[in-house]
Amino acid sequence: MKLSDMQLFRGLEEDDISSLLSCLNSVKRNYKKGEVILSEGSIIENIGIVLSGMVMISCNDIWGNTSILGSVAPGSVFAEVYACIPGQPMLVTVSAVEDTSVLFMNVGRVLTTCTNACPFHTNLARNLLTVCAHKSLQLSQRILHTSSKSIRGRLMSYFSECAKHAGSNSFLIPYNRQQLADYLNVDRSTMCNELSKMQKDGMVEYKKNRILLKD
C-alpha cells in the first residue's frame, strides 16, 4: 500500500509525503510476531501507522484476563488519542499479530506548523481528526456488538458488520477464536459451541477465519 492511499495522507502526493515525513522526523520500526510495540502505562508522543502486518489492541485486568479492543490493519493509525493527551498513560497494550512494520510520527510536529511553513500540515491535521472520528465509530461498533445478552446475538452483530464492510456474505475476520471471544467479551469454549450450533442451524459456515453467512 502506498502512503498516499492511506487515510492519514489523503490528498497528498508521494513527493509531498516524503518531504513531510522528513520534516516530522518520522521513524520506521519493524516488529516480530507477538512482540509488544507499546505497553500499558507508557506515556507516548508518537502516532503509529501500520505499513505492513497487523497490530492488536488489548488490555488486561488485575486478574490477568485479556480483552481485545480491536485490530489495526495496514494503512491505519494507532495510539493517536494517547499521543494527543500530554502525560496520559496508555490503558492498553499494542502488539504485533504478525511480522509488522510501523511508521512513527511525533504528534506535536503533526499539529504544529514547522519553521519551513510546509503547506501539507493543514491537510495532515485535518486527516488526523478524521482518523480519530473513525476510531470513535469503531469503539461504538464494539459497544453495539457486545450489547446483546446472548453469545449468538454478539456473533451475528459482529458478522453482520463484517459482511457489510466486505460487501459480501463471505469474509475473513482478523481474529482467531480466542481473540474473537476476547473482542466479544465471552468465554471461548461457550462461543465455539455456539458457533457449531449456528452452523448446524444453517446460519453460518466457517473454516478458520473464513466466515460465510447463509441466506
Q: What does each model-found stretch correspond to?
A:
Residues 1-33, 82-86:
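Cyclic nucleotide-binding regulatory module and flanking cytosolic helices
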Residues 3, 113-125, 130, 134-144:
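Inter-domain helical "communication" segments and dimerization helices
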Residues 24, 68-126:
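Cyclic-nucleotide recognition modules
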Residues 34, 45-58, 74-75:
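Glycine- and acidic-residue-biased ligand/ion/polar-headgroup-sensing regions
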Residues 36-42:
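Short phosphate-coordinating micro-motif centered on Lys-Gly-acidic
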Residues 55-67:
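A short beta-strand-loop-beta hairpin characteristic of the jelly-roll/cupin
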Residues 151-154, 158-215:
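Phosphate-/nucleic-acid-contacting segments
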